[in-house]
Amino acid sequence: MHPQQLVIAWLSLVLLAPPLMAIWELEKNVYVVELDWHPDAPGEMVVLTCNTPEEDDITWTSDQSSEVLGSGKTLTIQVKEFADAGQYTCHKGGEVLSHSFLLIHKKEDGIWSTDILREQKESKNKIFLKCEAKNYSGRFTCWWLTAISTDLKFTVKSSRGSSDPQEVTCGAATLSAEKVRVDNRDYKKYTVECQEGSACPAAEESLPIEVVVDAIHKLKYENYTSSFFIRDIIKPDPPKNLQLKPLKNSRHVEVSWEYPDTWSTPHSYFSLTFGVQVQGKNNREKKDRLSVDKTSAKVVCHKDAKIRVQARDRYYSSSWSNWASVSCS
């Protein structure tokens, strides 16, 4: 084929290729319109269809305007800004036939907006969702922060793998009583509990779990994603039942503890390692820290001090638990 013919054929393919989907259904009768967000953007042409066998005497209205917007079974609108979103309803006489609700997902300079959630600055990457698991049962908790109080809705979806996804069930997002203060501002904390349906605690993970949060504020839509292996988000509960036993003719004491009840069993397979530290008066920490695999240690315990113990998976460098403590006095 002549080079000029190749160029013409390639151009034909480009022109005939279907455009990227700029509007898609989030849930029944709710649609997301994806917009390039800059003053010169043309917006998106959206065709709404009235869900009725009727053909005649159909009119359209929206919750943004009291005027009749058009007539007929379909309505074509140009969506350029939030004033063009909202609920569109088709009527016949005084009867409502159906409605469609339009949300806007903004893209500025090629980047999807992240206005609804607060970035959690704990790594080099932008993180909006944080997830933790107390053990290898496949159950985990995710949370996020927002400064927004009203007109807010979250929906959470999760699966492991994409080609043949394994089911992960998530509950409803709930507002925590805990307020989180960041940069002198209080943020609301939302949490969700998820459970992998066919989790095998001892199995090696080959595919990550993906969590997607659909966030809606008024007429704005955003989504946030986190992808991880359970082993990477493990954070045990603190050790339990800390006890001190004085040692004869010694300044040392023996501190002992037990595995947390929520940790995976058997402990001979799902083993923990422990960090032990003496904290002095006024919460001053001694620099030396013991690392032990057994559930006891000998330390010097001064008056007014306390001993702290935390736990971590012995064979994988995931997160340490919070501290458990016992007073020396």
From Swiss-Prot:
Broad class of the protein's primary localization: secreted
Residues with glycosylation annotation: 135, 223
UniProt superkingdom: Eukaryota
Cystine residue pairs: 50-90
Database matches in InterPro entries: FN3_dom (IPR003961), FN3_sf (IPR036116), Hematopoietin_rcpt_L_F3_CS (IPR003530), Ig-like_dom (IPR007110), Ig-like_dom_sf (IPR036179), Ig-like_fold (IPR013783), Ig_sub2 (IPR003598), IL-12 (IPR050676)
Entry annotated with the keyword Secreted: yes
UniProt-recorded name of the protein: Interleukin-12 subunit beta
Organism lineage: Eukaryota, Metazoa, Chordata, Craniata, Vertebrata
Gene: IL12B
